[in-house]
UniProtKB/Swiss-Prot annotation:
The keyword Iron-sulfur applies. Part of an enzyme complex containing four subunits: a flavoprotein, an iron-sulfur, cytochrome b-556, and a hydrophobic anchor protein. Its EC number is 1.3.5.1. This is Succinate dehydrogenase iron-sulfur subunit. Pathway: Carbohydrate metabolism; tricarboxylic acid cycle; fumarate from succinate (bacterial route): step 1/1. [4Fe-4S] cluster binds at residues 171, 174, 177, 238. A ubiquinone binds at residue 186. Its cofactor is [2Fe-2S] cluster; [3Fe-4S] cluster; [4Fe-4S] cluster.
Length: 261
């Protein structure tokens, strides 16, 4: 009989408990995944009790309060606090989202916070985005043209052509969608994932780009594109309300047209 063995230090253990101090009018417990790869120790779940009446309304506000007032070693990324930069992407209450726009009041019970799933962890809630960014670079996410740039002018397009980019250019590369996708979990080394494919379609759909055929050929691969099985987790979890699954479908349709299907 085959014996199943977990990787070393993969079992998550109970960590420290930080009790609230003083008078508390609105107590909530926040459970945070803690892991430092420089230490030869298992990850833990640390618990923090905070008074929500003394913090802001978003999960990120609670994290900042914990870091500033309780445990300065808690590590996470954040920047804009407006849902624009994508830095604070993490798994909150079982769903990938942005901590800065996730209201605490929408979560019942203890607030459980983990890093984005199926990515290596740099520390605590900080995932290693290196592979994700390398995949983004591979699609050449810039305007590719054969004609010289106009002098003292922009490359113009019609209002109708510009509208084709709506729902695409707004992607902030937070990776919430890709890390919610089982196909990306299983084949992340080869499958580009919903975020990168949506970005690829953004340039394919741009009327100013002259290399549509080249871009489609680069994606016509059993793994890069066709590992998408329309599970739809990507569309469900996108904090910007975008539809990566639709973009992937559009790419597949354009490739089929090229083959006369």
């Amino acid at each position: 009989m085959a014996e199943l063995r977990l990787p070393p230090n993969s079992v998550v253990k109970k960590g420290k408990e930080h009790k609230a101090k003083g008078d508390v009018s609105n107590l909530r417990k926040i459970k945070i995944y803690r892991y430092d790869p420089d230490l030869d120790e298992n990850p833990t779940i640390d618990s923090f009790e905070i008074d929500l009446s003394k913090t802001g309304p978003m999960v990120l506000d609670a994290l900042i309060k914990i870091k500033n007032e309780i445990d300065s070693t808690v590590t996470f990324r954040r920047s804009c606090r407006e849902g624009i930069c994508g830095s604070c992407a993490m798994n909150i209450d079982g769903t990938n989202t942005l901590a800065c726009i996730k209201p605490i009041e929408e979560i019942s019970g203890d607030i459980k916070i983990y890093p984005l799933p199926h990515m290596k962890v740099v520390k605590d809630l900080v995932p290693d985005m290196s592979h994700f960014y390398a995949q983004y670079e591979s699609i050449e996410p810039w305007l590719k043209t054969d004609s010289p740039a106009p002098s003292n002018a922009e490359r113009l397009q019609s209002i109708k052509d510009r509208e084709k980019l709506d729902g695409l250019y707004e992607c902030i590369l937070c990776a919430c969608c890709s890390t919610s996708c089982p196909s990306y979990w299983w084949n992340g080394d080869k499958y580009l994932g919903p975020a990168i494919l949506l970005q690829a379609y953004r340039w394919i759909a741009d009327s100013r780009d002259d290399h549509t055929g080249e871009r489609l050929e680069a994606l016509e691969d059993p793994f890069k594109l066709y590992r998408c099985h329309t599970i739809m987790n990507c569309t469900k979890t996108c904090p910007k309300g975008l539809n990566p699954a639709k973009a992937i479908s559009e790419i597949k349709g354009l490739i089929a047209e090229r083959h006369g299907v």
